[in-house]
């Protein structure tokens, strides 16, 4: 408990040292990411991207002017540095200055060399990380940030990817994200310490068990390799190469779920469970690394920070991005605008 309290105080103190212009901007800006500030990037070479992109726009009431179009044939898993530079230039040329975040509507590409495409887009390509993927990463300016307008205040356009391999599954993710803010359900956040010691590196950051009454949320810490039969999941974080019994679970709209493993972000890989399986099981957003990160907790969502941000009313995009200290290899997927606790945002 002492470690948890010390961590919380340290993070809060770090967030308090925002510069004066940033604080002033936050004071006059809308609280948090708005639909009008999100751009949707559609791959015109992929029919699923076109269909799901338009579905997303209508579901969240995003202006048609916020839609950017690119053409990426053949669904490559990975882009070279030059290919990515050209893609990013095409996207940025279509974005208005007030755009704070971007949703890429496709399943692939999802990597730029060893970087995840979302990290490369938001932070810029990190070649040093690719020299040795098991080295420590570079800190993100957005980690635990209270910046309400990340592009305006920090020069960072947060990004997420919505996989579209199966149109109906992608639309189901969108539906869950769109309804997530309508009411606050009674829910649970599950944190599993598994028998896989290497993949338990962030277990020390699991929030303590208890009840957050205002949010109707119960925090549960379990020593188990999998969760079975839970029907009230808002958060599920664990450490396993493959997570069993997902078909027995029910995720509530807006649920976040991820597993600490090497290749969760390798959406087309088969050696470990893809983070996309979480979305298929009913989660609304997830995270995974696209290249071998080694088990640094800093390369994965910090459970304490993630929960605090989400319960404070952040969107899934803001909560997930703000919870990863070294995100170069990490792919953020799902519906960025999901925000089941938006009513609590100040």
Regions found by a protein language model. Give the residues of each.
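Cysteine-dependent hydrolase recognition
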Residues: 19-346
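N-terminal signal peptide c-region/cleavage motif recognized by signal peptidases
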Residues: 13-17
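Sec-dependent N-terminal signal peptides
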Residues: 4-12
């Amino acid at each position: 408990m002492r470690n948890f309290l010390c961590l919380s105080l340290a993070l809060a103190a770090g967030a308090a040292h925002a510069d004066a212009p940033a604080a002033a901007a936050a004071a006059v800006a809308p609280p948090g990411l708005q639909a009008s500030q999100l751009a949707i990037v559609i791959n015109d070479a992929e029919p699923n991207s076109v269909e799901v992109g338009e579905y997303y726009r209508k579901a969240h009431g995003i202006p048609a002017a916020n839609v950017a179009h690119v053409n990426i044939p053949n669904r490559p898993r990975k882009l070279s540095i030059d290919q990515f530079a050209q893609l990013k230039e095409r996207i940025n040329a279509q974005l208005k200055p007030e755009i704070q975040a971007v949703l890429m509507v496709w399943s692939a590409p999802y990597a730029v060399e060893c970087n995840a495409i979302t990290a490369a887009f938001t932070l810029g390509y990190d070649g040093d990380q690719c020299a040795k993927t098991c080295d420590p990463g570079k800190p993100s300016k957005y980690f635990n940030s209270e910046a309400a307008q990340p592009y305006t205040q920090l020069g960072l356009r947060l990004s997420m990817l919505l996989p579209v391999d199966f149109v109906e599954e992608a639309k189901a993710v969108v539906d869950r994200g769109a309804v997530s803010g309508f009411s606050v359900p009674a829910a649970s956040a599950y944190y599993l310490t598994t028998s896989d010691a290497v993949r338990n590196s962030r277990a020390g950051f699991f929030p303590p068990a208890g009840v957050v009454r205002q949010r109707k949320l119960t925090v549960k810490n379990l020593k188990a390799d999998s969760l079975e039969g839970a029907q009230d999941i808002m958060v599920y974080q664990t450490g396993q190469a493959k997570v069993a019994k997902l078909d027995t679970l029910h995720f509530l709209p807006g649920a976040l779920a991820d597993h600490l493993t090497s290749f969760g972000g390798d959406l087309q890989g088969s050696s470990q469970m893809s983070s996309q399986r979480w979305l298929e099981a009913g989660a609304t957003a997830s995270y995974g690394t696209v290249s071998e990160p080694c088990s640094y907790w800093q390369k994965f969502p910090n459970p304490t920070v993630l929960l605090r941000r989400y319960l404070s009313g952040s969107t899934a995009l803001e909560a997930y991005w703000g919870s990863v200290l070294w995100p170069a290899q990490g792919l953020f997927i799902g519906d960025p605008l999901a925000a089941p606790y938006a009513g609590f945002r100040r």
